[in-house]
Amino acid sequence: MKLHEIDTPALIVDLDRMERNIAALAGTLRERGVAWRPHAKCHKSPAIARKLVHEAGAIGVTCQKLGEAEVMADDGLDHILVANEVVGEAKLRRLVALRQRGVDITVAVDDPTVVALYGEAARQAGVTIPVVVEVNIGQDR
């Protein structure tokens, strides 16, 4: 098959190069005692995420959105950080459902109002929702 014949979007990976890059990064981080949780927003591949966790020593996976986290959890990954706030009743129900399944999912927040929403949703469902608080250190990102 020629490259122009591949239906897009498609993930095309040079496996040998990926293996070398993963080994180099994992080795460097291991030498320095750094725990790492790589972002899945580029590859969006549970298979690659599993490789990073089970073979390269990552402590989990970071997802941009709740939907990505659900895909990773459905594939057996259960240490997940969602880098963006999860808002809206339907999404909060989905987040709570992951916690009820036993998925170790943490959500980044930067708004106290959202923390209160998480607290109420968690209280109603009888679960906890771990959060990490994003602090604006002047870069306004």
Spans of features found by a protein language model:
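Generic N-terminal amphipathic, Lys/Arg-enriched alpha-helix
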Residues: M1-V13
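Short, surface-exposed alpha-helical recognition segments that flank or form part
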Residues: V13-D16, T106
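N-terminal glycine-rich anion-binding loops that anchor highly charged ligand groups
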Residues: R17-R50, Q64
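N-proximal short alpha-helices
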Residues: K2, N21-L25, G88
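Generic structural signal for well-ordered, non-membrane alpha-helical segments
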Residues: L11-D14, I22, D111, V115
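Structured helix-beta-strand junction loops
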Residues: P9, R32, R101-G102
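Active-site-proximal beta-alpha core segment in soluble small-molecule metabolic enzymes
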Residues: H39-R141
